[in-house]
């Protein structure tokens, strides 16, 4: 299996937009880049975390595609990558010649702050939210390697450096390690400039 086209919309906040409203323009760009018509698509896999049931079916309906299997994958932040894996598998196993993988989510629907987790989750029952969990893992990483938080700040520096040249990036302004370390703390060691932004 090979990727013959890709498309996306700029990362950002799109209040009032729907899942199809976010995905359809990106899919159309991917189809154009691939030189593929919607009628050639043999299967669709849609990865998301918070879209609910039938997210992929709603997107496909808005694209005017019918009569193909649509699988929805809820795999948290790995939903899009999982969709790509499953679409490639459809091709490799000879089920279809052309498969469409979609990764889409709408995180601003929660109004900011931490993302909601299910109450049955053992970490949630202990009061853990994702920033706290990642902070614990970061503390352990630094401890085991004898490093300071400066090493983690380099991740923000690298990500922002790549964002400067990417017209689809949510943030396109560079940041220094000192700025990342001096930013408002979220859960020690990560600061606000070291946490994932909320967006679509």
PLM feature segments, named:
Residues 16-34:
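Short catalytic helix/loop segments, enriched in acidic residues and glycine
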Residues 36-38, 53-54, 61, 65-200:
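Acyl-thioester C-C bond-transforming condensing/cleaving domain
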Residues 40-48:
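Short glycine-rich phosphate-binding loop at a beta-alpha junction
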